[in-house]
Amino acid sequence: MRAGDETETSIMRPQYPGDDIRPTSKKELAGWYSYGWAAEVFTVCAMGSFLPITLEQMARDRGVLLSDKVTPCSATLNGPSKTSTQAQWTLSSRYYAGGPTVVSQCVVYIFGVEINTASFAMYTFSVSVFIQAILIISMSGAADHGSHRKLLLVAFAVIGSVSTMLFLGVVPKIYMVGAVIAIIANTCFGASFVLLNSFLPLLVRHHPSVLRGAREPPPALDGSRAQEGHSDTTNDIDHGVESNATSPLLHAHQGNSENAEADMHPATPITVSQELKLSTRISSFGIGIGYIGAIILQIVCILVVIATNQTTFSLRLVLFLIGLWWFIFTIPAALWLRSRPGPPFTTTHQGKHTRSWIGYMAYAWKSLYRTAVRTRHLKDILLFLAAWLLLSDGIATVSGTAVLFAKTQLNMQPAALGLINVIAMVAGVLGAFSWGSVSRVFNLSASQTIIACILLFELVPLYGLLGFIPAVKSLGFLGLQQPWEMFPLGIVYGLVMGGLSSYCRSFFGELIPPGNEAAFYALYAITDKGSSIFGPAIVGIITDRYGEIRPAFVFLAILIFLPLPLMLLVDVERGKRDALALAAELQPSGAQTYGTLPANEDRAPPSEL
């Protein structure tokens, strides 16, 4: 160990056996960013573009027309490798009755049940989300306790990436195998990202800029020290990856180690604000890196599809490339991320089967119940999760509704829809990197920045509703009457996604009781993924009722607006104090706590659990 590292580790004392108290290094941050670069391509390029198309196309190759339930949807059923996506579009477009060209509906029979091929991918996604939720809950105990956090992250990454690569061998005759592989891949992706998110509060808590700020004199009343600390944080994040990745972020400091523990987390609003800003910047940088990787691979995949004549094999080939990208760039994360073991089970949980995987799973489900009970007494986490439930549902529903609207009512071709996806991703990168500057220019807090994103997001359904106004409708454009209007809305959607993805994740991390990261991020992920089934279902009902999608914009406008009053009620300072108090209360008698409680020693602990 380097001399500098030895000095650094003396600043803090281990709080439990195996506690990794080393300051966050540049190499460790690079490993965290690397996994975002590796895995974000799956959700953007696979789930957002090629995976649904591949599943639908393979089911279509084995399906029949809904209109007569006899005519095969594919004219080259026995030669799936020669089935051109463009040819399928042309063939299917022959069957429509007046008005704009609409792709004909095809059905397949699975265990005797008639299923629309367009719904096949959606059902596959729903099943994967259900399994994903169970898996996330079950593995949270092993992630929070012991040294399994990194092991699980790497394991899920390998299984998910290899599963995605296996699409290369899936042909339409075994399209159900493709559905199973998609379920495995999406489940592993979601679980791995929950584990990645659980590293974020730990990286922030041990970040040198936080430790440095904790050792310096209290801030002046004019906030000059807070501004200086913020500047240091900015410098560390902006140059952390570019500098020598093998060295610690912070060089050695002199200090009295006996008083270090009391100094590590001084409970002042300035420290809380500094950690939140740092968490937001790391999260934003990670999201931005992930989007950049997704854009690069998306362009490569589009070129591959064109070069291979847009066949069904082309779609399977790009899924292989997505899985290969995911696998290769997981390697730096596996090498550079530290395990950061969590606290061991307390004596009340230690038994013969405690350390077995069954014991971890049983403990995890009990912990979920306890987490839900504790959340009821953490007002700000409860408010935020309620807002996030609605907001994430709105994000997922707007994305799917917009694509469906563009296809069926604006008659946009697949290439144009792919271009919208690229534009949205570019805007997402800009959003991830620019919202921090916007918040500084306008002096916005993290919650206020999230609120600004919600207000901007609200413009999307409101713009679609303009099409109901007779004066606008008579113009023939505006209010989503022309295909080109989807492109600026894609920019708005991307900017909003870049901001919400980074700010919401880091904002929630500041409200989590230390030592319970994986459990609470599991709740965060379940709230995120579990909500996505409701919005699309309601949009489907509205569409069936009125015969078109545009009336669903009313529902979307309401859905996006509802999180706004909830976010206005969230107080991050109060939430941080409650989280630290709860963490201290949950520790067994005489154990070290994860940080220092607020200076107000007379403050009562949270309500009885």
Curated annotation (Swiss-Prot):
GO terms for cellular component: vacuolar membrane. Residues 214-238 are annotated as: Disordered. Glycans are attached at residues 244, 309, 443. The chain crosses the membrane at residues 95-115, 117-137, 151-171, 176-196, 287-307, 317-337, 381-401, 415-435, 450-470, 487-509, 522-542, 552-572. Disulfide bonds: none annotated. Keywords: Amino-acid transport, Autophagy, Glycoprotein, Membrane, Transmembrane, Transmembrane helix, Transport, Vacuole. One of its GO terms (biological process) is autophagy. It comes from the Eukaryota. The keyword rRNA-binding does not apply. CDD domains: MFS_Atg22_like (cd17483). It is found in: Vacuole membrane. Vacuolar effluxer which mediate the efflux of amino acids resulting from autophagic degradation. The release of autophagic amino acids allows the maintenance of protein synthesis and viability during nitrogen starvation. This is Autophagy-related protein 22-1. It comes from Neosartorya fischeri (strain ATCC 1020 / DSM 3700 / CBS 544.65 / FGSC A1164 / JCM 1740 / NRRL 181 / WB 181). The lineage of its organism: Eukaryota, Fungi, Dikarya, Ascomycota, Pezizomycotina.
